[in-house]
UniProtKB/Swiss-Prot annotation:
Protein name (database record): Mitochondrial import inner membrane translocase subunit TIM8
Annotated localization: Mitochondrion inner membrane
Motif stretch (Twin CX3C motif): 44-70
Membrane topology designation: Peripheral membrane protein
Subunit structure: Heterohexamer; composed of 3 copies of TIM8 and 3 copies of TIM13, named soluble 70 kDa complex. Associates with the TIM22 complex, whose core is composed of TIM22 and TIM54. Interacts with the transmembrane regions of multi-pass transmembrane proteins in transit.
GO biological process: protein insertion into mitochondrial inner membrane
Transmembrane segments: none
Domain-related comment: The twin CX3C motif contains 4 conserved Cys residues that form 2 disulfide bonds in the mitochondrial intermembrane space. However, during the transit of TIM8 from cytoplasm into mitochondrion, the Cys residues probably coordinate zinc, thereby preventing folding and allowing its transfer across mitochondrial outer membrane.
InterPro entries: Tim10-like, Tim10-like_dom_sf
Disulfide bridge map: 44-70, 48-66
Gene, per the UniProt record: TIM8
Role: Mitochondrial intermembrane chaperone that participates in the import and insertion of some multi-pass transmembrane proteins into the mitochondrial inner membrane. Also required for the transfer of beta-barrel precursors from the TOM complex to the sorting and assembly machinery (SAM complex) of the outer membrane. Acts as a chaperone-like protein that protects the hydrophobic precursors from aggregation and guide them through the mitochondrial intermembrane space.
Entry GO MF terms: metal ion binding; protein transporter activity
Family membership: Belongs to the small Tim family.
Length: 90
């Protein structure tokens, strides 16, 4: 929101302000999801390829399985945390 001045927002009608704010919130959410995916992928890649030299442009079957399992565990954990937080809010 730092790139949109308060004066510019104030000059818009209420509907346009709401649309812009919803768009900004949506983009922020997308950015957070992309950052999480990047962080999980980076962490899992390092875990699954520790002390292994990269010898080709593709993963072998054990590396691929390790990455899949690692990412799935973190996604499952995130889902459980979100569900627990949603349950706590009720």
């Amino acid at each position: 929101m730092s790139q949109i001045s308060q004066t510019a927002l104030a000059s818009l009608d209420e509907s346009s302000r709401k649309d812009i704010m919803q768009f900004i919130e949506s983009e922020n959410s997308k950015s957070k999801v992309q950052m999480s995916i990047h962080n999980f992928t980076d962490m899992c890649f390092k875990k699954c390829n520790a002390n292994k030299p990269i010898t080709s442009g593709t993963l072998d079957s054990s590396e691929e399985q390790c990455l899949t399992n690692c990412l799935n565990r973190f996604l499952d954990t995130n889902i459980k945390v979100v569900q627990a937080l949603q349950g706590a809010q009720k």
